[in-house]
Amino acid sequence: GCYGFIGFNFLQKLIKEHKDEFEVTGIDLLNNSYSKLNYQQLNTGENFEFLSENIIDINKINFKKNDFDLVINFAAESHVDTSIYNPDVFIQTNVLGVNNLLKFCLENSVKKYIQISTDEVYGSTRNHYFEETDILNPSSPYSASKASADMVCNAYMKTYDMDIKTIRPANNYGPFQQPEKLIPFSISNIIENNEVEIYGDGSNIRHWLYVKDTVEGIFKVIEKGESGEIYNIGSGIYHNNNEIAEKLLSKFNLSKNSIKYVKDRPGHDFKYAVNFDKLSSLGWSPKYDFENALEETTEWYLENKNWWSEGIVQIRKNRDLRISLARNAYKK
């Protein structure tokens, strides 16, 4: 998943700041216009090998070398709406794909494995801040597939004594996020003079985390994380969807009258919240102020319309279709 959202932000830092420290092999399916553009624009240098492959077929890939010290898995199907009406691809990529990666690591004596999970595996909350030891209670097929992957990782660790660490970030935002997600979808709609669509009444709360803070957290786990441990990554910043929409609209001198409320997503979780003291104990802390990071993100989408404009029309069509199919699936 090296050319996806978090994976690409991680890869950029790895290549730009640590290019002489590692030999890196990246795998990505390149199954959308955004990952293809990411692939085209990054000068990776001599220490990087890229393979356009599916992790489900990891054992069929011909690597130039396979004596890896570390595998980090960013690859995932991640759109909740899609998972409601088409869960199969989520099980294939997020569960079977992870199983195949772990088998590859086991068979090739890979020393360490890091699974990038999500805070959504804990399920919804009102006042509780989930800790890494809390029981998983996923609500959507997407989060269930990620929770299943976490359990597969746990089983491989216990059965085969593998060095596995799991990272569960909060809701990420920032440059290179596909515009089907709330913040970039809203920004792109505003730029193109469309209404900002919000599910339900907009009261759903998310724990917002700038992607560059996430990347730093991953590097900290690589550096200091302990085998078998799970690490939440959070920021302590919480906003509901109405607040996010209003903040973005205000940057363009627009009022909340530009918000369009649409029928809520089936099984929409009210709030995600995680305690990230364990990662903080390793010496990590979020560095980016939310307002400044949101401004930086907005500027990036303004300056990089060529990156997202090709796919946004289809995303809007798919969004309408997904909402309709998801509701019908839920009714059945």
Regions found by a protein language model. Name each.
Residues K36-L37, I84, P179-E180, W208, ...:
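Conserved strand-to-helix beginnings and helix N-cap segments that scaffold or border functional pockets
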Residues H128, P179-I187, K263:
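A glycine/serine/threonine-rich, flexible loop-to-helix segment
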Residues N9-K13, L30, E53-N54, I190-K332:
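C-terminal substrate-binding subdomain of Rossmann-fold SDR/epimerase-dehydratase oxidoreductases
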Residues P138-S145, P169, P175, P179-I183, ...:
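The catalytic Tyr-centered alpha-helix of NAD(P)H-dependent dehydrogenases
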Residues F5, S78, Q177, H239-N240, ...:
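Short alpha-helical
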Residues G1-N172, E296, N304-W307, V313, ...:
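N-terminal Rossmann-like NAD(P)+-binding domain of SDR-like oxidoreductases, especially those catalyzing
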Residues N59, D81, D88, N99, ...:
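Residues in well-ordered alpha-helical elements
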Residues S148, V152, Y156, S186, ...:
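Hydrophobic alpha-helix immediately C-terminal to the catalytic Tyr-X-X-X-Lys motif of short-chain
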